[in-house]
Amino acid sequence: MNPSAPSYPMASLYVGDLHPDVTEAMLYEKFSPAGPILSIRVCRDMITRRSLGYAYVNFQQPADAERALDTMNFDVIKGKPVRIMWSQRDPSLRKSGVGNIFIKNLDKSIDNKALYDTFSAFGNILSCKVVCDENGSKGYGFVHFETQEAAERAIEKMNGMLLNDRKVFVGRFKSRKEREAELGARAKEFTNVYIKNFGEDMDDERLKELFGKFGPALSVKVMTDESGKSKGFGFVSFERHEDAQKAVDEMNGKELNGKQIYVGRAQKKVERQTELKRKFEQMKQDRITRYQGVNLYVKNLDDGIDDERLRKEFSPFGTITSAKVMMEGGRSKGFGFVCFSSPEEATKAVTEMNGRIVATKPLYVALAQRKEERQAHLTNQYMQRMASVRAVPNPVINPYQPAPPSGYFMAAIPQTQNRAAYYPPSQIAQLRPSPRWTAQGARPHPFQNMPGAIRPAAPRPPFSTMRPASSQVPRVMSTQRVANTSTQTMGPRPAAAAAAATPAVRTVPQYKYAAGVRNPQQHLNAQPQVTMQQPAVHVQGQEPLTASMLASAPPQEQKQMLGERLFPLIQAMHPSLAGKITGMLLEIDNSELLHMLESPESLRSKVDEAVAVLQAHQAKEAAQKAVNSATGVPTV
């Protein structure tokens, strides 16, 4: 964005709890009635490009953002009520806990909106959330007020009150570290004792008799089932911590009716789960450490290889502690694991056995990795590869193969598509970043100075990537687009033939017109090239457009300049669909659009394809609406 443009620190909204299929266009339709929007961005996973369930909507005016927050919070989009709050970019303010309260023992029927409506009487709410899982509400939630005073008023008035006939607890929000510290302090001063494994013949009186010798007890209870039969465990609550500690020390592990009983501090369910989880994680970490560097992963196994054969093949390299072929339904899955007693033996086995043919197949042998490690490693490799590809403007290719223009990437390597924010056309003029390249001249083509060389045609992206645009909602303009060259056959065209076909040679600058891609500049020591006169694209009533004019314009203006010249031509062919088709065509690369402006046949071909795509989309929408109306499902 232009640094001189005004900033709107409080005109940005966070929109959460989104359905995975919600797009920027849907959010634009939803929020645009509140006021002019600068941009919309649905946050997505870098690799899978799936929605993360939240988005940011940036308004031009804070008053419009406030109106949207007041009137649209908890509105339903694609069957899910969305949660809107002010975007707070400073994490210290979000995590400080100031103004944040915790509410528990909530009725299952209380949702985000009901909680918001209940607590909004005490002050301005920044965020409000009932914690849910796949089964619905978990019975607790959080409300973050703008001020600490509002939070204290809510605690004072609402703690112990009835909400939907349930007495709720309302208190100051405490971080996990604070809660664990409090639990630890309380645990040291426990008075409640848990006893288990004492059999079915135990009752309250007998349990009191057993533990009464340690000190006065407030309560004694043996837990029973519906028939009154003991469940084998119970509780004794002492008056003093010292008596409880003495009972645990003396009674834990003693035999009672031929059974060894357990006596310990009574724990809440959350405490027990936390402790078990911690023990499990510790065991898991110990196991990982123990097998680090000694466990091998073996794949591409022949179907006839079993555990014994696998052990036999690897036994020459050292002492094997375990060998296992993974099976499913009695059949080998084609891979297994071999664990050695030392890392040296495992390393030797990898060196000797990787690639060796056993039975009928060459084995793949490597150190075993946990799933998380493997995924992290693959992701890291992928990101490094993408970074290296982006760093090289033109990958080294066969000199006789037509080279892609500078700024394009070879399609043989998969590319991530970094989706940009959604910019309405009314705001594009305000979002003009400075050009990232010199506009004095185009980068010379690698074949330019070779006499008689074949000049490759610029690759044209397949039209199937275009999507129909709504007349009310503009297209999402991606700031980084990768040309797909693998699906397009590029026909070589001799320079002489090209010169004969056209009165003047059109030299299109080898740039990918995208705001997020840094185009390479000419080398300082490069030989000066003869600048050939570029033909201008003439559209009646418009200023002539040349490739150099386009290159010197800011990125957002480039599409506008092209759109202004495309629209009258398309309007002459399809007056009612001109706006939609123009928006669809503007997703094509600028060099291709220039060619279409010069070639009426090429333009007509693309327009016909766009009309076909648009008609197919409209037919699909009509069919979906018919299905929804027949089944009574409301359309969003």
UniProtKB/Swiss-Prot annotation:
Record key words, sorted: Acetylation, Cell projection, Cytoplasm, Methylation, mRNA processing, mRNA splicing, Nonsense-mediated mRNA decay, Nucleus, Phosphoprotein, Repeat, RNA-binding, Spliceosome
SUPFAM superfamilies, sorted: PABC (PABP) domain, RNA-binding domain, RBD
PTM sites of type Asymmetric dimethylarginine: R493
PTM-bearing positions, type Phosphothreonine: T319
This protein's GO CC annotations: cell leading edge; cytoplasm; cytoplasmic stress granule; cytosol; dendrite; lamellipodium; mCRD-mediated mRNA stability complex; nucleus
BP terms from Gene Ontology: CRD-mediated mRNA stabilization; mRNA processing; negative regulation of nuclear-transcribed mRNA catabolic process, deadenylation-dependent decay; negative regulation of nuclear-transcribed mRNA catabolic process, nonsense-mediated decay; nuclear-transcribed mRNA catabolic process, nonsense-mediated decay; positive regulation of cytoplasmic translation; positive regulation of nuclear-transcribed mRNA catabolic process, deadenylation-dependent decay; positive regulation of nuclear-transcribed mRNA poly(A) tail shortening
Chain segments annotated as coiled-coil in the UniProt record: none
Localisation per UniProt entry: Cytoplasm; Cytoplasm, Stress granule; Nucleus; Cell projection, Lamellipodium
InterPro entries: Nucleotide-bd_a/b_plait_sf, PABP-dom, PABP_1234, PABP_HYD_C, PABP_RRM1, RBD_domain_sf, RRM2_I_PABPs, RRM_dom
Single GO MF descriptor: mRNA binding
Domain PABC, residue spans: 542-619
Domain called RRM: residue spans: 11-89, 99-175, 191-268, 294-370
Protein's UniProt keywords contain tRNA processing: no
Residues with PTM Omega-N-methylated arginine: R455, R460
Modified-residue entries (Omega-N-methylarginine), positions: R385, R419, R432, R436, R475, R481, R493, R506, R518
Modified residues (N-acetylmethionine): M1
Domain of life (superkingdom): Eukaryota
PTM-bearing positions, type Dimethylated arginine: R493
Subunit structure comment from the entry: May form homodimers. Component of a multisubunit autoregulatory ribonucleoprotein complex (ARC), at least composed of IGF2BP1, PABPC1 and CSDE1. Directly interacts with IGF2BP1. Part of a complex associated with the FOS mCRD domain and consisting of HNRPD, SYNCRIP, PAIP1 and CSDE1/UNR. Interacts with PAIP1 and PAIP2 (via the PABPC1-interacting motifs PAM1 and PAM2). Interacts with PAIP1 with a 1:1 stoichiometry and with PAIP2 with a 1:2 stoichiometry. The interaction with CSDE1 is direct and RNA-independent. Found in a mRNP complex with YBX2. Interacts with TENT2/GLD2.
Family as reported in the entry's similarity comment: Belongs to the polyadenylate-binding protein type-1 family.
Protein's recorded name: Polyadenylate-binding protein 1
